[in-house]
Amino acid sequence: MSLMKEMLSVGVHFGHKKAFWNPQMKEYIFGINHGVHIINLEKTVPLFQDAVNFVGKTVANGGKILFVGTKRQAQDIVEAEAKRCGMSFVSHRWLGGMLTNYKTVRQSIKRLAQLEKMREDGTLESLTKKEMLQNIRTIEKLEKVLGGIKEMGGLPDAIVVIDSNKEHIAIQEAQKLGIKVVAIVDTNSNPEGIDYIIPGNDDAVKSISFYMKKFADAVIDAQGLDRAVEAKADEAAQA
């Protein structure tokens, strides 16, 4: 099946109601059907391919990708696909300063690691019941917000965002730090300042699954390429 047909089958072309449009998305709109803007997939297909290729190249060069999708219908998909390809993710709430104040965030990640170790080795059980419950609540709270980035080990090289409107703070932080931004941009969104714009439906579960699967597959393919290059380098060094 062609990429265009795949996109049509999962509803990537359905935008928002005409009343909610952002005029800056005009060049990506094909027309209107029953009061809903229809996205021009002839524009979306090459832009999506460019974005997927960029993600793959970034990973092949040893870079890190952070997937961001905190809206209800994106949360589980973003988490599952990010885990499948071994990349970091934010799927519950974007903590202000998650990128721009990463030093402080890193301290919270260290705290989470310490508490998890205490839980694993039984240290928590030696505390009073009140202290133990407080620490367990802290673990749950930190895990919910930071669990997806605790293995990131530094700032990402790029972020991939589902819904540029909802994740505008994440995008602003990435822009401030010169981190590349890949984003699904619906007809009600502002495409300004996004490095890799993907005009498309950011609400339908099938569309979100489609994007995330393609990105995760690109990461996995690139990791295989990266390992193959490393293996060749090792062989050359031993020769």
UniProtKB/Swiss-Prot annotation:
It comes from Francisella tularensis subsp. tularensis (strain SCHU S4 / Schu 4). GO terms for cellular component: cytosolic small ribosomal subunit. Keywords: Ribonucleoprotein, Ribosomal protein. GO terms for biological process: translation. The gene is rpsB. GO terms for molecular function: structural constituent of ribosome. It comes from the Bacteria. Belongs to the universal ribosomal protein uS2 family. This is Small ribosomal subunit protein uS2. The keyword tRNA-binding does not apply. HAMAP family: Ribosomal_uS2_B.
